């Protein structure tokens, strides 16, 4: 039996793709260890995967909310969040090293977590990349200017990993590319959503999205009754962006009032602190953790933050989107949805108001039939790719 380890940091959306991959690997005879923040133990173990706690015992989504709440600029917010996560990765290297020991393969997550440790241990690696913008165009002819600017950026990106390399007496690298697998980089995105860049090296493979149907889920009686009692509701699912550092009644009011004024029924996920003493009208209800594979099929469209996982779920389950990106990478995923005409143009978080939300709901209604048709068509195509199965097939080819 082949033994593999995956270590990842971040919110649930950063962990979920690796749960899907781990489950498929286990089905194919692998022994898998998935390491992450201690707060994700139940999520991972409930999926039948061996869990290893990595890093401090913190609520990562609340920590991310505190950082986000202090900065309004999406690029700066993303940079501060990345610095926070990189600091945890550096401080957790001993735990990552222990999780990697004795394994036949290390699957290096999108934060490059485990890459240095695998190199020290002499264990082969496979990479996973969620943002295609992070993949170098190695086959593109480079001008002198390209080389100079690229070298400067690469040096900055490599800094956190060189700090880890120093712990093990390793020489610094000039680029994070030097610690990536030279054989396989898995990109869990559909070729029907993003075209393969002709300047990528052959090792970079668009597998299709990784997902799980979660067919065993049964909603509670209250949620089932609400779904059955009227028109399909709007789903408000801001993911980790609705985890509040403090009560955000003003933001929730914007959405609730916009739903009232547009005559929209709605299901609202998140806003736990605000919801404790918040009274919703009968046309709306709050729900906790419900699988997107079930919830999104019940909705008319989704208003969401465009994290990787939620964006993928809207495409997999064939539902249009109103994107509300909060940080820079989310803006990129929002543009992917808009480019294939399954979403309105993004409504940036800094521009949120009752009026702008109403305008986006009206924009969605005006083009809904076309967007819904496109979403369902792409969903059918995605299902022909068998993304997570393709990923495991490629891994098998590599190590057998």
Residue spans for each PLM region:
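Conserved nucleotide-sugar donor-interacting segment of glycosyltransferase catalytic cores
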Residues: 86-155, 192
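Conserved nucleotide-sugar phosphate-binding/catalytic loop shared by glycosyltransferases and other
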Residues: 33-78
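N-terminal subdomain of nucleotide-sugar transferases
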Residues: 1-52
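A short, active-site helix/loop in glycosyltransferases that binds the activated sugar's phosphate group
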Residues: 156-202
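A donor-sugar binding/catalytic signature common to diverse glycosyltransferases
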Residues: 105-109, 287-336
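Donor-nucleotide binding loops and adjacent catalytic segments primarily
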Residues: 195-301
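Short, polar loop motifs at secondary-structure junctions
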Residues: 36-41, 109-114, 190-193, 269-276
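Conserved donor-nucleotide binding/catalytic region of nucleotide-linked donor-dependent transferases
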Residues: 344, 349-350, 354-355, 360-378, ...
């Amino acid at each position: 039996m082949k033994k593999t380890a995956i270590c990842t940091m971040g919110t649930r959306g950063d962990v979920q793709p690796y749960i899907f991959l781990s489950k498929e690997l286990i089905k194919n005879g692998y022994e898998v260890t998935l390491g992450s923040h201690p707060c994700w133990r139940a999520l991972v173990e409930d999926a039948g995967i061996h869990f290893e706690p990595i890093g401090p015992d913190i609520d990562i989504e609340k920590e991310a909310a505190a950082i986000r709440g202090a900065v309004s600029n999406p690029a700066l917010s993303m940079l501060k969040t990345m610095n926070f996560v990189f600091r945890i990765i550096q401080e957790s290297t001993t735990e990552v090293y222990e999780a990697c020991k004795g394994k036949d393969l290390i699957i290096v997550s999108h934060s490059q977590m485990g890459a240095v440790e695998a190199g020290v241990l002499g264990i082969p690696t496979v990479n996973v990349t969620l943002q295609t913008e992070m993949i170098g165009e190695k086959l593109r002819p480079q001008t002198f200017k390209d080389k100079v600017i690229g070298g400067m950026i690469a040096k900055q990106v490599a800094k956190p990993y060189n700090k880890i390399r120093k712990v093990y007496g390793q020489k610094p690298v000039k680029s994070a590319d030097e610690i990536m697998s030279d054989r396989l980089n898995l990109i869990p995105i559909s070729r029907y959503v993003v075209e393969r860049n002709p300047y990528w090296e052959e090792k970079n493979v668009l597998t299709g999205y990784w997902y799980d149907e979660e067919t065993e889920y049964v909603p509670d009686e209250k949620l089932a009754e609400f779904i059955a009692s009227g028109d399909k509701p709007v789903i408000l699912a801001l993911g980790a962006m609705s985890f509040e550092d403090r009560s955000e009644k003003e933001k929730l009011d914007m959405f609730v009032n916009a739903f009232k004024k547009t005559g929209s029924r709605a299901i609202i996920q998140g806003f736990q602190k605000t919801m404790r003493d918040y009274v919703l009208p009968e046309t709306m209800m709050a729900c906790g953790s419900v699988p997107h594979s079930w919830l999104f099929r019940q909705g008319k469209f989704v208003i969401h933050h465009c994290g990787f996982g939620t964006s993928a779920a809207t495409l997999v389950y064939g539902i249009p989107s109103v994107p509300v990106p909060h940080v820079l990478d989310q803006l990129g995923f929002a543009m992917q949805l808009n480019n294939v005409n399954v979403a309105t143009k993004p409504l940036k978080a800094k521009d949120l108001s009752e009026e702008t939300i109403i305008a986006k709901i009206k924009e969605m209604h005006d083009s809904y039939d076309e967007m819904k048709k496109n979403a369902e068509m792409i969903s059918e195509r995605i299902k022909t790719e068998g993304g997570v199965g393709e990923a495991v097939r490629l891994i098998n080819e590599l190590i057998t």
